[in-house]
C-alpha cells in the first residue's frame, strides 16, 4: 500500500495532483512496482476542495507547514507512514519580492522543517520538490546562455529563485546523506491556470488567456516579443508524477531536472488565442508595459533544454493552441 503527502495540497497543482493519484488508485514508488493507494494527506493553510475532503482515502491537515512540522507539535507525525511526499507549498515570486520575510518563512524555513521531519521518519521516503525555472537568471556579469540546460549553473535574480535553489541544494544533501530520496524538478511557468489570479509575477501568462476567454480584459505587462518557457498543467503534473515513480537509476543523480518547456513569445500566445477563440477575444488583451515585471522577466530564460527529462520520457506541449483547447475543455461545467 502506498501513502502520499502533498504539501500545498489545496492549491491548484496540489489538488490536481491529488485527483490524478486518487483516480489512478495506485502509485509506483521509485520504480518498485505499482502499489494500491491507501491514503493521500493534503497539508495546506487553505481548506481542501470539497470533492477531495469527501474522499475516504484523503486526510486533510490545515495549518502553516512550518508550524505543523515543528518538533514540539506534530513534528514528523504529520508525515507518518508516507512513502512519497510532494512538496508543492510555497509563496510565489511576486509575494517574495514584496515580502522578503514571507519568502524566507514559506520557501526556506518550511522546507528545512519538512526535510528534517522526513529524516526523523527514518524510512528514506521519496521527496519530490517543486522547484522552478526561476533558479536561472541573467545578470551583466553572468548573462544567460542561448538556452539553459540541466548543467547550467543557477544564478537566480529574485528572492523566490534564490529560495528555490537553496531548497534544491538542501534536498540534494539530505539525499547524499541517505536520509531520503530527493527528486527536484524545475517547473516552467504553468499556463493556463484556471481560477483566480495569484501573486506570481508570471501570473499574467495565464491571465491573458483565461480572462479574455471569460469575456474580461487582461493586461500584458511585457512586450509582445518576450520569450517565455511554458508548460501546461497536464505536463507539470506529469513531471511531478514521473519524479515519484522513476527508479533511482533512471532518475540519475541528485541535481534538479528541468521540466520540458514550450518556448513561445507572448505575441505567439496571443496569436494562438486568436486562432482558437477568434479576434474579438484576443482583442481583449491590453498591452500595458510594467517596467518592474519586464525587468524580472528579462532575467528569466525563455529557452530550456531538458535532456534528463527527455530520457525519462517527458515531452513538452506540442503547441500553445492545444494548451488553450485543453483549458477550454477542462473549464466547461
State what each model feature region is.
Residues 37, 289, 301-311, 315-333:
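Amphipathic terminal alpha-helices
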Residues 2-27:
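N-terminal Rossmann NAD(P)H-binding glycine-rich loop of SDR-like oxidoreductase domains
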Residues 98, 102-113, 158, 162-163:
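Glycine-rich NAD(P)-binding loop of the Rossmann-fold in SDR/ketoreductase-type enzymes
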Residues 112-157:
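Conserved Rossmann-fold NAD(P)-dependent oxidoreductase catalytic core, especially the SDR/UDP-sugar
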Residues 212, 235, 239, 243-294:
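Mid/C-terminal beta-alpha module of Rossmann-like enzyme folds, strongest
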Residues 172-227, 233-235:
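NAD(P)-dependent short-chain dehydrogenase/reductase
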Amino acid at each position: 500500500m502506498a501513502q502520499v503527502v502533498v504539501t500545498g495540497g489545496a492549491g491548484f497543482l496540489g489538488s490536481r495532483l491529488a485527483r490524478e493519484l486518487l483516480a489512478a488508485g495506485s502509485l509506483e514508488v521509485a520504480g518498485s512496482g505499482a502499489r494500491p493507494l491507501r491514503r493521500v494527506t493534503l497539508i495546506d493553510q487553505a481548506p481542501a476542495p470539497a470533492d477531495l475532503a469527501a474522499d475516504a482515502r484523503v486526510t486533510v491537515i490545515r495549518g502553516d507547514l512550518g508550524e505543523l512540522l515543528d518538533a514540539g507539535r506534530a513534528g514528523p507525525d504529520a508525515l507518518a507512514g508516507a512513502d512519497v511526499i510532494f512538496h508543492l507549498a510555497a509563496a510565489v515570486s511576486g509575494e517574495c519580492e514584496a515580502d522578503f520575510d514571507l519568502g524566507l518563512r514559506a520557501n526556506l524555513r518550511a522546507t528545512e522543517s519538512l526535510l528534517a521531519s522526513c529524516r526523523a521518519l527514518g524510512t528514506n521516503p521519496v521527496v519530490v520538490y517543486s522547484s522552478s525555472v526561476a533558479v536561472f537568471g541573467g545578470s551583466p556579469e553572468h548573462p544567460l546562455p542561448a538556452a539553459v540546460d540541466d548543467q547550467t549553473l543557477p544564478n537566480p535574480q529574485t528572492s523566490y529563485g534564490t529560495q528555490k535553489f537553496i531548497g534544491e541544494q538542501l534536498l540534494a544533501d539530505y539525499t547524499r546523506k541517505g536520509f531520503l530520496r530527493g527528486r527536484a524538478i524545475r517547473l516552467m511557468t504553468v499556463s493556463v491556470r484556471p481560477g483566480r489570479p495569484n501573486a506570481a509575477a508570471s501570473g499574467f501568462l495565464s491571465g491573458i488567456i483565461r480572462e479574455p476567454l471569460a469575456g474580461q480584459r487582461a493586461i500584458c505587462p511585457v512586450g509582445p516579443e518576450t520569450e517565455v518557457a511554458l508548460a501546461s498543467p497536464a505536463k507539470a503534473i506529469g513531471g511531478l508524477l514521473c519524479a515519484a515513480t522513476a527508479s533511482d537509476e533512471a532518475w540519475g543523480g541528485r541535481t534538479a531536472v528541468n521540466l520540458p518547456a514550450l518556448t513561445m513569445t507572448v505575441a505567439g500566445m496571443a496569436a494562438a488565442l486568436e486562432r482558437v477563440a477568434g479576434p474579438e477575444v484576443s482583442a481583449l488583451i491590453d498591452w500595458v508595459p510594467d517596467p518592474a515585471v519586464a525587468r524580472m522577466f528579462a532575467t528569466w530564460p525563455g529557452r530550456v533544454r531538458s535532456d534528463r527529462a527527455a530520457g525519462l520520457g517527458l515531452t513538452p506541449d506540442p503547441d500553445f493552441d492545444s494548451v488553450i483547447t485543453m483549458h477550454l475543455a477542462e473549464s466547461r461545467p
